Design a protein with these regions (language model features):
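N-terminal hydrophobic/helix-forming segments and targeting peptides
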Residues: 1-463
């Protein structure tokens, strides 16, 4: 090949590169530091309530204060508001007023899990169980025969909130039992999504009886007695509880080269933390920078703590009113990075990917012009001008990025909060970290992509 042809190819062809070929040692050192703090965020927030509480703890350490309606705000002020303990909005006030819009990064901090039912505890064949109702798009077979924790809150009749954490550290764990292969012939003939029925996702909570032989529900009684001893609760209190069953392992490096992170909850805390840390680490921005950490994305962003809630609008309107600005004027000049994970190309399951248009681990922040399913159903399809804007912002900041879709057209699909931000007349596009084994109890991401996500969030805030 002549030098002329080589130069022409380099100029005209797209040539994605592994991010490790594009960064220097200083960036790699910064990447490791960032990822260590991210792993701490994961371990401190295995539920949306825990994430919200830890977010507030970190924000207060950075000088953020609760926003009070009517506060006078000046450039550089740092405020936050918590919505019912499950979602958080933070803002760093910019030099320009909100008539020029805001630079928003929106993520979510809920993850697929198992929720306790209102009447969860029962005994069968001298075992005590807790019945669950799965939350979000899980693959049920992945949740059996793995160690589990129970986390959440019980709200007593008088309104007292009791925090529950069972299975942490060296504490005893829980498990959902599976069928042994010796007796699994019929189960093995079933499709994966039918092999473990939802009603069989019952966690094993104990087997030792309390009381005299011949008494009923002796194992259940011991479990309930232990819960009462530790937390002061009785069985009726489960009706006003939010108890979540989550995997009982912490975030860890993966691979001999430690280039990956394995953990529960990368979707979407990997983007939520990047949005948060990016906000912390910018100076006073030109436009007000807003970080939204929402709840309920995994079930459609519904409800008072989801992205469809008026909570976001109320917070933004309060900020606008403090500057005498119309909310709608602010929205039409704003930009939102819907920061949610995307599917990473997995060569073990190549048949469901369209390789030319997939995000890959270690190739940087993954932009998705549109998500949805099949004919882009349920997606927010960003226009070409928005994609060009994001390209420019990321390139100017030296962020390694890529663009792709989520699998083959008819293989499935997914959605994010992007459509709900776009419905508010806010220019919006999706971008996030490629994830392997998404929605499983133990997801995998690349450290380089995590770091580029963080740099990308900072670039958006500063744009």
């Amino acid at each position: 090949m002549t030098d002329e042809m080589k130069a022409k190819r380099e100029k005209l062809f797209s040539s994605p590169k592994n991010g490790y070929d594009l960064v220097d040692q200083a960036a790699l050192d910064a990447m490791e530091t960032y990822c260590e703090s991210y792993k701490q965020y994961l371990d401190n927030g295995k539920t949306e309530r825990e994430c919200a509480a830890y977010t507030v703890e970190l924000a207060q350490a950075q000088g953020y204060v609760p926003y009070q309606r009517g506060m006078s705000l000046k450039p550089g002020d740092k405020v936050y508001r918590v919505n019912r303990g499950k979602s958080v909005m933070l803002a760093k006030i910019g030099r320009q007023d909100l008539s020029h819009g805001a630079q928003i990064v929106a993520s979510h901090i809920d993850s697929p899990r198992l929720d306790f039912k209102p009447h969860p505890l029962y005994e069968d064949s001298d075992f005590a169980y807790g019945k669950t109702h799965y939350y979000g798009g899980i693959r049920k077979y992945q949740w059996v025969a793995v160690p589990l924790e129970l986390r959440g809150v019980v709200v007593l009749r008088d309104g007292t909130v009791v925090k529950v954490v069972l299975g942490q550290g060296s504490e005893p764990k829980f498990v959902i039992t599976d069928l042994l292969p010796h007796l699994g012939a019929e189960q093995g003939k079933k499709p994966l999504n039918e092999a473990i029925p939802g009603e069989n996702l019952n966690i094993l909570m104990g087997s030792r009886p309390l009381g005299q032989e011949g008494d009923s529900d002796r194992v259940k009684l011991r479990v309930m007695d232990l819960l009462h001893e530790k937390y002061g609760i009785c069985e009726d209190d489960f009706t006003s509880a939010e108890l979540e069953v989550v995997p009982a392992f912490n975030a860890t490096d993966l691979g001999l080269d430690r280039s990956l992170i394995g953990a529960y909850g990368h979707d979407d805390r990997v983007c939520g933390y990047a949005a948060l840390k990016g906000l912390f680490d910018i100076d006073v921005p030109e436009k007000t920078a807003v970080c939204m950490l929402a709840d309920k994305e995994e079930v459609g962003s519904m409800g008072v703590t989801g992205m469809q809630s008026a909570f976001f609008d109320t917070f933004m309107e309060d900020l606008c009113q403090s500057q005498g600005v119309s909310l709608r004027v602010c929205y039409e000049s704003s930009f939102c990075l819907s920061s949610d994970v995307t599917a990473a190309y997995d060569p073990n399951f190549a048949e469901v990917y369209e390789k030319r248009n997939e995000s890959r681990v270690n190739y940087g922040l993954g932009i998705c012009k549109y998500t949805g399913a099949r004919g882009k159903s349920g997606s927010s399809d960003a226009d070409a001008e928005t994609v060009a804007y994001v390209r420019r912002v990321l390139d100017n900041a030296g962020v390694v990025w890529q663009i792709g879709e989520m699998g083959k057209i008819d293989a499935g699909g997914g959605g994010t909060v992007a459509q709900y931000m776009a419905n508010r007349n806010i220019t919006t596009i999706d971008a996030g970290v490629p994830v392997l084994s998404m929605h499983s109890p133990f997801e995998t991401v690349g450290k380089l992509d995590c770091y580029m996500n963080y740099l990308g969030c900072m670039a958006v805030y500063n744009a």
